[in-house]
From Swiss-Prot:
Cellular component, GO annotation: membrane
Membrane-spanning segments: 20-40, 49-69, 86-106
Keywords associated with the record: Membrane, Transmembrane, Transmembrane helix
Organism: Saccharomyces cerevisiae (strain ATCC 204508 / S288c)
Coiled-coil stretches noted in the UniProt entry, renumbered to this chain: none
Identification of the protein by name: Putative uncharacterized protein YDL011C
Membrane topology: Multi-pass membrane protein
Amino acid sequence: MADKLSSTDAMGCWSPTFCFISLISSSTSELPLFVVEVGIAAYSLEDPPAILSILVLNALEVSSFISTVKKFAFCATKNTNNNNSVVMLKILAFLLLEGIIIKLFLY
């Protein structure tokens, strides 16, 4: 797990798991630590929907959601020729979809 968290590709982009941790580390005061741990575990099991349900908790705050999307977009587009970027693009697509759903039903 430690290798997965700290690994970078040839272009120096972090692994999706590390990006996930860095995304929510800025808002850990808002989220219980166990939620962060569950998110990391979910990603380790390669279960993106479980991660997204956790990210949606953070996305309920619009400014935080926009920041999250921007960070995922940056990591996803930094190097489009590797598997990490493909995973990031998929998560970004789901985040955008979740953002639309949240906007439709909660605002």
